[in-house]
Amino acid sequence: MADIVVMGAGLGGVIMAYEMKDQMRPEDKITVVTKDPIYHFVPSNPWVAVNWRTRESVEVDLAPTFARRGIDFKPVPVEKLDPEANSLTLADGSTLKYDYLIIATGPELAFDEIEGLGPVNGHTCSICHVDHAEKAAVNFEEFCKNPKPIIVGAVQGASCFGPAYEFTFILDTELRRRKIRDQVPMTFVTAEPYV
């Protein structure tokens, strides 16, 4: 019997848990450990930011979803990883032993590395997390009341540029639907060496 632990339950962690469950032997056990009991389908965040989707429509409660597939689930943050002992110490003080560990914790957003960047302490919107996308949706509705030039893009250090392009086209579409696109000069900014 092998104890398989997936650390993280975002897009990569959930897919990995499903794939591992399909491939493992009947006597093996798989456990997913993550800090958030709710899964947010990140690829839909650009839609949330223009009110094409709601937060509720892109969320899944992980406990019943994993239970249906026979995957153990611990919605508790990991405090310590001990590779020599093949164990994780969780925030509730419990220890989780493993034979195989898959780390799929996703990105750590670093808005503080650029002054003025970010939806919390900065002056920019973000679609990186559903919380950010909801705030962007509120800002977008206010923006549409008084349309003006807008800048869309991704900064240096971004690990994924695709959503910035997607959001640009979504924004263009929604502004056209609202018949205000002609009032919104749009500039796309990227740290990529070429487009």
Please name every model-derived segment.
Residues A2, R68-E166, I170-K179:
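FAD-binding core/adjacent interface of flavoenzyme oxidoreductases
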